[in-house]
Amino acid sequence: MAQHNLGYINLLRGNIAEALQEMYEARPLAGTTPIALAVCDTDRAEALRDAGITREAERLLASVAPVFGRHRMPQSRAEVEFQLARSQLTHDPVTAARTAATASRRFRALGAETWAIRADGIRLRARLSRRSPRSADQAEVERVASALADSGFANESTALRLSLDIWRSGRGMPHPAPVTRVPPTASIDVRLLGYEARAARAAAAGRDAVARRQSASGLDQLTAWQQAFGSLDLQTSVRMHAGGLMVAGLTAAARSGRADVLFEWSERGRHLSHQVVPVRPPEDPQLAADLAELRQRMSGDQTGRWRLDPHFAELEERARERQWSATRGGGIRRRATLREVQARLDDGTALLSFVYTGTELAVIVVTGARARVVPLPGWAAAAKLLPGLRADLDMAASIRTGPMADVVRRSLDDRLASLSSALLDKAVRVPGAERFVLTVPGILEGTPWAMLPALRGRTFTVAVSATRWSAFDRDVSVGGRVGIAVGPRVARGEEEADAVAAAWAGHSPEQLRGTDATVDAVTALAGRVDLLHVAAHGRHAVDNPLFSGFEMADGALFGYDLDRVPEVPEVVVLSSCEAGRSSVRWGEEAVGMTRVWMHAGTRAVVAAPVIVADDAACDLLGAMHAGLAAGLGVSEALARASTETGILAPFQVYGSGF
């Protein structure tokens, strides 16, 4: 257990990556009995929760609770419920309050009053959440906070008092005392709560500039703590800790009405999870072996029963944790200012930066000469159209003939027109603008921008952030070494590969087809070419986006496999269903195969966020490659191909398409 305990010490110190690594390595040695294994997994769940990976943490806690129950260990079972409530507090305060209340009752039945008070603290913090329909009794909050402090739990006492402070500010209530002092030994989440409490007080007093400064200071502290995380998985997950500060800063920025202020805060949010420069991990034979076994199990059982196999879950978990610990941070990328971004915009280019405060949506329209904020009051009605959009798109791709095709198409056209009107009609009215850079919040993730009437046939790119877009050279021609890979069972896949190869005939493209298109061969090819085209069936894993991928001859090529590519291509074209889909984490971060490629260094990815008909993909992308080979940029080639072929499809460019 010594190595496991070292991991727990790292957890208490806030060294999450080190804690996860130590606990992972110690698990086979420390978990010699079911009880010992359950104790180890409870601690690991706490580390996962602090890293923002709450779903896995809660799944782990749910699996260990029955172990303590079977062995008649009610105290340990109640402690698991306490940890479960702590995790739920970050995203589901109603459930957290119930879980904490159950734990508190169990502790009191055992005579464990101190533990019961700790559970009461979580229950009250859940009630003080802005998302809770019930509020907490302030007198009880003070009583429990004092009891926690008297019992030596200063961190938890401070967190409870700060939560009450934020709750009072949100309701415009007076404060009887200054903001609770945060101890220097406080955990990162409590330190951030301190900044949020001061920002909330300032906002309630109408001092928005102070609210923004406090929020920014807290986010800077989070950045300093985040530097060790090179893994995309961890970088996007720790955004959990930034939620309150981002809402406070963005809301205060929106109230200013100033484009420069709102732009700064929109970039803060987008830049947060990709500001750490990842150091590519060294070759890991064990990780490669685990991924290969996962592939084999998945491809060998088409029924999906492999998902129920505990060994599969163990392999998946082990692969994730090896990647977390192996990928380190290599410094912080500086966030671009509005003036720096404007200097990169020529007369024909405009940036449309969509900003969501949690209640309102606006777009900052930026050109080289000016920036203005355009409110989008029609957003509330348009938002109701999003839930059914994916179903309409999927049906339109699947039902292309017969009497139902017209019905489906009309429903989709109406939905797209309404979204376009609400989101873009005012924003694209930029004199002289012929191409657009879009940056979007998580609430708009999955929008098929290329199909919205305001952008049909127009040149645009969906960037991770304005900072990342501006870091790349403009209008770089695509070419050099070209690679093509075709997965199994793709209708017109061979024809599509022929069209791509014909477009690049002068470059002698390297091709992998049939049984030659294995995962190892494709990852090796990716490391040799400047442009990679993959025609394969895609798969998006909602629970674990880095296990998304596409099917090759011997199984799925996962997002994790890209760590095996020493130098990724400049441009990647993913002609596969769902390859452009993403999962949204903590309201902002979108993670999927497109993001994995860009995190690894790819400049532009062409993909679709929804199902695409095979014939549309073949014809449209074949025409796009002809444009690329003729010297057009990625976004322009795709837009021109859509106009020339008359094909309206959800393919769009992510990253820097021009």
How would you name each of these model-derived features?
Residues 24-31, 62-73, 101-112, 142-150, ...:
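Amphipathic alpha-helical segments of tetratricopeptide repeats
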Residues 142, 146, 172-182, 188-196, ...:
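Amphipathic alpha-helical protein-protein interaction segments
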Residues 14, 52, 91-92, 131, ...:
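Residue-level detector of the short coil/turn that links helix A to helix B
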Residues 336-381, 385-403, 407-658:
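Catalytic cores of enzymes
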Residues 10, 48, 88, 127, ...:
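Residue at a conserved register position within TPR or TPR-like alpha-solenoid repeats
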Residues 1-6, 30-44, 69-83, 108-123, ...:
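Alpha-solenoid helical repeat architecture
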Residues 125-136, 154-181:
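Basic/polar, acidic-poor N-terminal "presequence/leader" segments
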